[in-house]
């Protein structure tokens, strides 16, 4: 009996520790994002981040070794946020496929909008093969896989409904590549409110769904 | 920017080409079927329906100016077969639009906030679609019912692309002189003006003030705090569009009353305000069973230098019959200062016959014009054809002509009988409007 309570307390304590750790991680990320939005990715130092987050610089390194780790954490968090938003949004449940996919990218862009400069910097960094942000790093691959599964499930639903023909895993890969293209376009879009990106996104998704529906692979 | 524009233009070119190809394809299919099976009237009707549905779908996807062209075509009652017309008239209100998520995103792109952060309630399903956007119902935080018009993203560059294509497509017509270059430019200017909702808000204010004497007319009020150049929030207006209104079978008296009021509105705008609501497609009018009228969509407004009172004087007095100088003056009024006199004279006989119907000379004659009169239509199309053949279209009259054509189309659909002469007499004599006119001019 006693042992059991002790065990429970231990689990509870560990739970609390994990929770606290997550809390600090989020506080650091919030501080960093604020600085990135104001000063830019390159000019923000770990020193200023730790000062803003109200922790010692040494503590910061316990959580994030480099600024790249911070960026990775940011992308993981925003992917989790999108999945959660998608699963709880009532409109997305009954929308047609082009609208669902539009909603996902639009939601992503909306959350990225304040950190445009930061995203641009991360894009450049990810081109370096040794970078943790490179699409071939294990961390990036893990996140990418989670994203592919998320999209794959949405496409599978549309396949079930007969909205599009069976695409297999290729559909999710194609959409991921498309999303990279859209973000690149978005970064360079100087129209007000980035409405050119909205138009591009809408037309591409409507047309591709239309063509897939019409002829599948045979057209 | 330029590069993107080019890509869009190629895309549109491809789609237009596809439209042409797919139409030709099914025409050929029809011919082959015809050859094998012999012609049946039933099949012909069905075929027309299919072809025009395809036209409508493709135009809907293209949006922008090409769709406007579709709308213009659909107003040419006698040019297209009845079935094609019915399909095309769907374009006027029910154009394929943005899904709720896109409309919401575009709202934010324009106003910086999502609609649910601005309004107490916002209906994500649009209740009306226009070629440049769509309209959603909403309720403001203070509880007022409003209509929110949201523009399709990047429609402006889409229109510019369409006109680049239109210019090359109309090159033969322009070279032969049947289509003045100025006309295409004027249409482009008109369409581009329609994309600026700030301009439209100014127009709404101008006409609300200028036409306030016409108590049967309602024009929406603008909520500037929720409007930009791409989103326009207006007070909600009750009423039904023409097609739905006619389904209720309104009495001839109500239809005549509405017809007379529409004519009065048109004459008042031309004569007193010197500005005309030039987009007379039926979706812009809302009718109520007691004869009240709501006028919405003020995107296309034409400032007019058209001297309607001088022209009406000519029509009523047949001045051109009095001397050659008077005849020249009359032609200048209709076709502009550089009118080729000889060619204009060829149009005169048809014009005189039209005039005898619309403005009968004999004071005792029944001056009521039945807009369903086939004779009127026959003369009307003869007149348009003559003008085209004699190359008499003055560029500055393009949009006024479009407005008048639209008005006549509505009067035809309505089956209204209007005493045009009397309407003009009353508008001209309405001294009370004088003050409103100066008010409106001041505010503009």
Language model features: what each stretch is:
Chain A
Residues 112-138, 149-155, 184:
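Amphipathic alpha-helical segments used for helix-helix packing
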Residues 74, 78, 82, 104, ...:
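Hydrophobic/aromatic residues within well-ordered alpha-helical segments
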Residues 86-93, 122-130, 158, 186-190:
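Secondary-structure edge/capping motif, primarily at the C-terminal ends of alpha-helices
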Residues 132-160, 169-180, 209:
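Amphipathic alpha-helical packing segments from all-alpha helical-bundle domains
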Residues 31, 77, 108, 154, ...:
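Amphipathic alpha-helical segments in well-ordered regions
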Residues 73, 88-121, 141-142:
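Hydrophobic alpha-helical connector segments
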Residues 27, 31, 35-73, 77:
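Helix-turn-helix
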Residues 1-12, 149, 153-157, 184, ...:
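C-terminal peripheral helix-coil segments that are non-catalytic and often amphipathic
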């Amino acid at each position: 009996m006693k042992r059991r309570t002790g065990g429970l307390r231990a689990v509870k304590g560990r739970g609390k520790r994990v929770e606290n750790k997550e809390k600090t991680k989020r506080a650091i990320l919030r501080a960093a994002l604020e600085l990135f939005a104001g000063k830019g990715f390159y000019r923000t130092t770990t020193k200023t981040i730790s000062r803003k987050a109200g922790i010692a610089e040494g503590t910061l390194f316990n959580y994030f070794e480099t600024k790249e780790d911070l960026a990775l954490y940011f992308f993981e968090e925003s992917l989790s946020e999108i999945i959660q938003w998608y699963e709880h949004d009532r409109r997305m449940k009954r929308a047609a496929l082009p609208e669902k996919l539009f909603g996902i990218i639009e939601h992503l862009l909306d959350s990225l909008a304040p950190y445009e400069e930061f995203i641009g910097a991360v894009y450049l960094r990810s081109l370096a093969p040794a970078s943790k942000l490179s699409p071939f790093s294990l961390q990036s691959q893990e996140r990418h896989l989670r994203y592919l599964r998320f999209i794959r499930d949405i496409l599978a639903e549309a396949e079930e409904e007969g909205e599009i023909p069976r695409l297999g895993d290729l559909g999710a890969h194609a959409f991921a590549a498309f999303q990279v293209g859209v973000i690149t376009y978005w970064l360079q879009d100087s129209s007000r409110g980035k409405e050119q990106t909205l138009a591009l996104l809408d037309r591409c998704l409507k047309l591709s769904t239309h063509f897939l529906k019409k002829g599948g692979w045979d057209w | 920017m330029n590069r993107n524009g080019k890509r869009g233009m190629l895309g549109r070119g491809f789609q237009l080409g596809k439209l042409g190809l797919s139409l030709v394809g099914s025409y050929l299919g029809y011919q082959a079927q015809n050859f094998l099976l012999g012609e049946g009237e039933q099949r012909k009707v069905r075929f027309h329906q299919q072809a025009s549905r395809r036209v409508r779908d493709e135009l809907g996807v293209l949006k922008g100016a090409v769709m406007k062209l579709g709308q213009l075509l659909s107003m040419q009652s006698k040019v297209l077969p009845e079935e094609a017309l019915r399909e095309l008239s769907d374009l006027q209100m029910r154009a394929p639009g943005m899904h709720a998520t896109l409309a919401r995103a575009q709202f934010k792109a324009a106003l910086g906030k999502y609609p649910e952060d601005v309004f107490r309630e916002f209906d994500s399903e649009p209740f009306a679609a226009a070629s440049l956007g769509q309209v959603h119902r909403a309720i403001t935080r203070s509880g007022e019912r409003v209509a929110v018009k949201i523009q399709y993203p990047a429609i402006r560059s889409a229109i510019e692309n369409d006109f680049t294509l239109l210019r090359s497509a109309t090159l033969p017509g322009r070279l032969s002189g049947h289509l003045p270059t100025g006309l295409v430019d004027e249409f482009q200017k008109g369409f581009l003006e329609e994309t600026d909702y700030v301009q439209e808000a100014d127009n709404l204010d101008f006409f609300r003030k200028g036409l306030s004497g016409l108590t049967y007319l309602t024009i929406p009020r603008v909520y500037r705090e929720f409007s930009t150049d791409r989103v326009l929030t207006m007070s909600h207006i009750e009423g039904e569009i023409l097609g739905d209104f006619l389904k209720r079978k309104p009495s001839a008296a109500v239809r005549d009353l509405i017809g007379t009021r529409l004519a009065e509105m048109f004459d008042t705008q031309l004569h007193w305000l010197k500005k005309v609501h030039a987009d007379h497609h039926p979706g812009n009018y809302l009718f109520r069973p007691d004869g009240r009228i709501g006028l919405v969509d003020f995107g296309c407004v034409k400032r007019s230098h058209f001297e309607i009172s001088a022209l009406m004087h000519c029509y009523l007095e047949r001045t051109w019959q009095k001397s050659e100088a008077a005849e020249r003056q009359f032609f200048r009024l209709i076709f502009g200062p550089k009118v080729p006199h000889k060619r204009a004279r060829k149009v005169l006989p048809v014009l005189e016959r039209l005039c005898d119907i619309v403005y009968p000379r004999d004071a005792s004659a029944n001056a009521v014009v039945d807009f369903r009169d086939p004779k009127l239509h026959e003369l009307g199309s003869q007149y348009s054809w003559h003008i085209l053949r004699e190359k008499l279209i003055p560029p500055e009259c393009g949009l006024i002509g479009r407005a008048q054509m639209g008005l006549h189309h509505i009067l035809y659909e309505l089956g209204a009988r209007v005493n045009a002469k009397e309407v003009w007499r009353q508008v001209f004599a309405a001294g009370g409007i004088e003050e409103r006119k100066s008010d409106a001019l001041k505010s503009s």
